[in-house]
UniProtKB/Swiss-Prot annotation:
Residues 78-632 are lumenal. Catalyzes triacylglycerol (TAG) formation by an acyl-CoA independent pathway. The enzyme specifically transfers acyl groups from the sn-2 position of a phospholipid to diacylglycerol (DAG), thus forming an sn-1-lysophospholipid. Plays a major role in triacylglycerol formation at log phase. Involved in lipid particle synthesis from the endoplasmic reticulum, promoting localized TAG production at discrete ER subdomains. It is an enzyme of class 2 (transferase). It catalyses: a glycerophospholipid + a 1,2-diacyl-sn-glycerol = a monoacylglycerophospholipid + a triacyl-sn-glycerol. One of its GO terms (biological process) is triglyceride biosynthetic process. Its main location: endoplasmic reticulum. This is Phospholipid:diacylglycerol acyltransferase.
């Protein structure tokens, strides 16, 4: 349902007033923007045909930017601008002129003209449009109130080197993830870069002689590389109503680590607990936690850790005493199908949809096996494997999000055939996880068993038992929310963008499983990828189940903590690489005006004005799932 049109309590001023001009006592009112009804969001798969431009862009963009960065440093011209003539010079680096022509057809040299190749520090000057939500809401009387802590998602936090072994020295205190230094290292010193990014397979910690740590401060996650913003628009809009470093924190972390290792190596959860307690004391206000993607899993784990005896030792009322609200943005609380593909073969939609020349170039530089080998050492990535079994994700003949599909089921996460002449075997999520274990080494299997659980608790007694088991804390289908009747939870995510739901696999000539990109059906399956509605990373099922059903039950929400669900339609601008201010894609939603309105309302103490709103078919989907007994 759509919310009412914006209403304001006073006439809009042309200029932003200062805090002296506008009394804090003024009570603001603001209605969130209207959105189309559910009927306007149908036929998601057909929309994917509107433009082929974006199919390969994300992955190719990373590759071409890296090649440009490597070439720049190789020639040593600090003032180089990548005009077409210059681009032609490094086309040979790809080993295929056809590949380069393919990539070049998508990218203009203007993409690179403002790239600050001599610095890692991005421009931080916000434009008026980027902070308009904050400026308008400041004019309407909204002010900073509760301290705010932001918990970024997977790969969002920059990682910088603190090592002094031979190849590390040139990169000391430079980011090997999340900067132009990363791209330089990837292309000019790939082996050194891999040695830093990969973790020890047995311990899940740093390899000997390597020390890579999460960058700190707002710069850790505001931009990935220059021009590619992540949290910057949220930070800017919060600042517009009075937030600054004394009442706002970006709690960056090393997303490669398992959650137990985050505490063991970095004392991440201990430091997060201390900052929350400090904020309560100094500001005499509870904290608002804002998380995105994997950050929502980290936050949920923190809720269990902080109250547990022998861990955070906060006691059973700590969350209720210290947390005002939890804003869960596009949270991967029950995992994502694309994690299976990333760990199984080092692939996902962006790589599967490259043409043969692009695949050749990518494989020549950074092969599937190398990518899979790297991510399998990262316990944090494995935390996003799907949870809930066939009850949640379905089987070969049924899935809760099949809805009106009659000849095809989303329940087969993997459809696998050894060679082109055979039929595909269909694997549900449990089979797919076993298939993954069959092709990985013992260290990976031990890491999974030690840190994570993927089941579903059927009784309250089972939930209470699981609450005492750290390996279960990652899974909201096996453990419960803390007893926090005063805390409010807001679940916000995008809908209306084709998203990975399953995969067709075959074997390559070396006998390794790879996505079978030859499979297409013209509607739902593209290059071996089964697509469904979602935000481009997480399908609707993963985005909406926990907040709309799991946390609506006493078993998983014993204090009846308030849950507000708000969906935002993905409405990308046609000629904007990031989709523009109406994009609700998994990352781009952080710049969406409606999301920023919600964040400012909640943090300023007006979260009660945020309504529930549904655009997708999530209510129909969750009605197909029975959490009280296993399927026959």
């Amino acid at each position: 349902m759509a919310s009412s049109k914006k209403s304001k309590t006073h006439k809009k001023k042309k200029e932003v007033k200062s805090p002296i001009d506008l009394p804090n006592s003024k009570k603001p009112t603001r209605a969130l923007s209207e959105q189309p009804s559910a009927s306007e969001t149908q036929s998601v798969s057909n929309k994917s045909r509107k433009s082929k431009f974006g199919k390969r862009l994300n992955f190719i963009l990373g590759a071409i930017l890296g090649i440009c960065g490597a070439f720049f440093f190789a020639v040593g011209d600090d003032n180089a601008v990548f005009d077409p003539a210059t681009l032609d010079k490094f086309g040979n680096m790809l080993g295929s002129s056809d590949l380069f022509d393919d990539i070049k057809g998508y990218l203009s040299y203007n993409v690179f003209k403002d790239a600050p190749f001599t610095t890692d520090k991005p421009s931080q000057s916000p434009s008026g449009n980027e902070v308009q939500v904050g400026l308008d809401m400041y004019n309407e009387g909204y002010r900073s109130d509760h301290p705010v802590i932001m918990v970024p998602g997977v790969i969002s936090s920059g990682l910088e080197s603190w090592s002094f072994n031979n190849c590390s020295i040139p990169y000391f205190r430079k980011r090997l993830w999340g900067s132009w230094s990363m791209l330089k290292a990837m292309f000019l010193d790939k082996q050194c870069w891999l040695e830093h990014l990969m973790l020890d397979k047995k311990t899940g910690l740093d390899p000997k002689g390597i020390k890579l740590r999460a960058a700190q401060g707002f710069e850790a996650a505001d931009f990935f590389i220059t021009g590619y913003w992540i949290w910057s628009k949220v930070i800017e809009n919060l600042a517009a109503i009075g937030y600054e470093p004394n009442n706002m924190l970006s709690a960056s972390y090393d997303w490669r680590l398992s959650y137990a290792n985050l505490e063991e190596r970095d004392k991440y959860f201990s430091k997060l607990k201390m900052f929350i307690e400090y904020s309560n004391i100094v500001h005499k206000k509870k904290v608002v936690l804002i998380s995105h993607s994997m950050g929502s899993q980290v936050t949920y784990y923190f809720f269990k850790w902080v109250e547990a005896e022998g861990y955070g030792n906060g006691g059973p009322t700590w969350v209720n005493d210290h947390i005002e609200a939890f804003i869960n943005i596009s949270g991967s609380l029950i995992g994502a199908p694309k994690t299976v593909a990333a760990l199984l073969s080092g692939e996902m939609k962006d790589t599967a949809q490259l043409n043969q020349f692009s695949v050749y170039g990518l494989e020549k530089f950074f092969s599937r096996s190398e990518r899979a080998m790297m991510v399998r050492t990262m316990g944090g990535v494995s935390s996003m494997l799907p949870k809930g079994g066939d009850v949640v994700w379905g089987n070969a003949s049924w899935a809760p999000d099949d809805l009106n599909q009659t000849n095809f089921s989303n329940g087969a996460i993997i459809r696998y055939r050894e060679d082109i002449d055979k039929d595909h075997d269909e694997f549900d999520i449990d089979d797919a996880l076993q298939f993954l274990k069959n092709v990985t080494d013992d260290d990976f299997k031990v890491m999974l068993a030690k840190n994570y659980s993927h089941g579903l608790a059927w009784t309250e007694k089972e939930v209470l038992k699981n609450n005492e088991m750290p390996s279960k804390w990652i899974n909201p289908l096996e453990t419960s929310l803390p007893y926090a009747p005063d805390m409010k939870i807001y679940c916000v995510h995008g809908v209306g963008k084709p998203t990975e739901r399953g995969y067709y696999y075959t074997n390559n000539p070396e006998g390794q499983p790879v996505i079978d990109s030859s499979v297409n059906d013209g509607t739902k399956v593209e290059n071996g990828i089964v697509m469904d509605d979602g935000d481009g990373t997480l399908p609707i099922l993963a985005l909406g189940l926990v907040c709309n059903k799991v946390w609506q039950t006493k078993r998983f929400n014993p204090a009846n903590t308030s849950i507000t669900n708000y969906e935002i339609k993905h409405e990308p601008a046609a000629f904007d690489l990031r989709g523009g201010p109406r994009s609700a894609e998994h990352v781009d939603i952080l710049g969406h005006s409606e999301l920023n309105e919600i964040i400012l309302k909640v943090s300023s103490g007006h979260g009660d004005s945020v309504p529930n709103r549904y655009i997708s078919d999530i209510q129909e989907i969750i009605n197909e799932i029975n959490l009280d007994k296993p399927r026959n």
